[in-house]
């Protein structure tokens, strides 16, 4: 049979490729990866209240992305949690009973600690 041919609008686009290379230069020259690793270490300590929360069954972190599995009987947990987070000015990603925290690189330690505290408040009600 015939194969399905699929391509993207920007495949091989010279401007897009140059922009990507410039970003890689910034990552190398400005020490972005090392800075993110240091931030991830600080955030691991700041996230300790989530790791210890009685509703959290599995806390994990990969770099600057954190996730917790939540023990709850709410059948609509993800929808409920998302609404509660928005009400507290948080944009978090619950999928099923797992909540992901993926803050942008520009997040300060104080803002991250506030997000952790607000997430714990929501978990108190779960």
Report residues per predicted region.
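Conserved N-terminal phosphate-binding loop of PLP-dependent enzymes in the Aspartate aminotransferase
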Residues: 1-126
């Amino acid at each position: 049979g015939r194969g399905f041919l699929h391509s993207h609008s920007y495949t091989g686009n010279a401007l897009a490729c140059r922009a990507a290379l410039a970003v890689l230069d910034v990552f190398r020259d400005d020490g972005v990866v090392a800075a993110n690793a240091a931030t991830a270490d600080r955030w691991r300590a700041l996230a300790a209240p989530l790791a210890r929360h009685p509703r959290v069954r599995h806390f994990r972190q990969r770099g600057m992305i954190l996730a917790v599995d939540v023990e709850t009987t709410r059948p609509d947990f993800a929808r409920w949690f998302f609404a509660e987070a928005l009400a507290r000015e948080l944009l978090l990603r619950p999928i099923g009973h797992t909540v992901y925290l993926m803050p942008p690189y520009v997040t300060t330690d104080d803002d991250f600690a506030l997000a952790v505290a607000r997430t714990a408040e929501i978990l108190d009600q779960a």
